[in-house]
Amino acid sequence: MGDCFIVGTCLWILIYPFYAWRKRKGAKKTVGTIIRVLMWVYIWFYFAWGLNYFRFPFYERTGIAKAAFSAEKFQDFLTGYVGKLNESYSKAGDTLSGWYLERYTTAGPMSKIPVAGVIQEGYGKMASRFGLVEPGKFLRVKPMLWSRLMSRVAVTGYMGPFFTEFNLNQELLSVEYPFTYAHELAHRLGIASEAEANLYAYLVTSAAQEPAIRFSGYFSMLGYVVNNARRLLTEEQYQEIVKRIRPEIVELYNSHLLYWREKYNPGMGQIQHQVYNAYLKGNQVSSGTKNYSEVIGLLMSLQEDRIFQVGSVLQFPGTALL
């Protein structure tokens, strides 16, 4: 419904001036009508979901102290993460790699795994600890109506605020489906920050008993880990980290990047990036689209706080990183 509403509103804005002209409505009245409609859309956006942008920040809401960065701590984090990434691949099994790069479909191999049930159960266990809305059984993911268009601007999922629907791109690969589902569900449960949504998606998927879901969690975090490592480490240190990753995972990662790059349109993508960057900055996310990669800082802060060892209802695999 959200997709139809947005498209319908845009079409109305384009068509209404011609309708008003034919009905001999004055320009002032026409503009006034459009402004009033947009005002109500604006109000609807915030009352339906947008007020989540004004929640207390993660550290203030959870009482967790923000970790001070140090090269040694980051190296420890990377060592633990790469070890768990490799382990999750081993437990998932080499045979899975054949369909990880297939598009997710309701009839494909990944559909036999109860992704929605596992992830919603995980969120239910940690909702109170992190100030999330506990997921209801009525929640259902919606497919994007224009997935091919969204792929051209690198959008794999989004939260539809007007009807509080979370939507997934129908061109998602099986390897990324569980993590992306968990990320968008986090938005549906009241989390506006992209870094936080990544954090909870990672915690839920990497704690799952199902090997394919667990690997999806570690694998989907790899891009953010790589980006931070390139920025914070020397080239020699960076290459040393990459060498520790199983070659099968590196190959899968490169194939995954190629899959989306072939669909991406640089011109359209840049416009979407600038618009969404401005949108985030205008809604209390000062770092804009860079907020996605800030998930690494949240994870390192959780490690220092030792949240994983104080009676957490989920046995988060991050314990091994401490």
Regions found by a protein language model. Give the residues of each.
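Post-HEXXH active-site segment of zinc metalloproteases
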Residues: 193-221
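Membrane-interface segments at or immediately adjacent to transmembrane helices
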Residues: 50-120
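Active-site recognition of the HExxH zinc-binding catalytic motif
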Residues: 177-203
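Auxiliary, metal-adjacent structural segments of Zn-dependent hydrolase domains
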Residues: 97-164, 170, 174
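Pan-zinc metallopeptidase signature
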Residues: 249-322
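Internal/C-terminal transmembrane anchor helices
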Residues: 26-53
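Membrane-embedded alpha-helical segments of integral membrane proteins
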Residues: 1-20
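Acidic/histidine-rich catalytic neighborhood
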Residues: 215-245
